[in-house]
Amino acid sequence: MAKTSMIIKAQRGSKFKVREYNRCPLCGRPRAYYRKFDMCRICLRKLASAGQIPGVIKSSW
């Protein structure tokens, strides 16, 4: 879990647009962020496995 101070710091607007970065709103993780789902890969996998994200299915071939 991310430090609370880092999550709050990321939510605040930056003086420069380039310095802003995305964080997962569920766990606060800054890396492996999927813009389409607005969450990190770990939370995406957890929610997709539970069937809580509509339209996402497990692939098999």
Curated annotation (Swiss-Prot):
Family per similarity comment: Belongs to the universal ribosomal protein uS14 family. Zinc-binding uS14 subfamily.
A GO CC annotation given for this chain: small ribosomal subunit
GO MF annotations in UniProt: rRNA binding; structural constituent of ribosome; zinc ion binding
Keywords, sorted A to Z: Metal-binding, Ribonucleoprotein, Ribosomal protein, RNA-binding, rRNA-binding, Zinc
Protein name: Small ribosomal subunit protein uS14
Function comment: Binds 16S rRNA, required for the assembly of 30S particles and may also be responsible for determining the conformation of the 16S rRNA at the A site.
Protein source organism: Geotalea uraniireducens (strain Rf4)
GO biological process per UniProt: translation
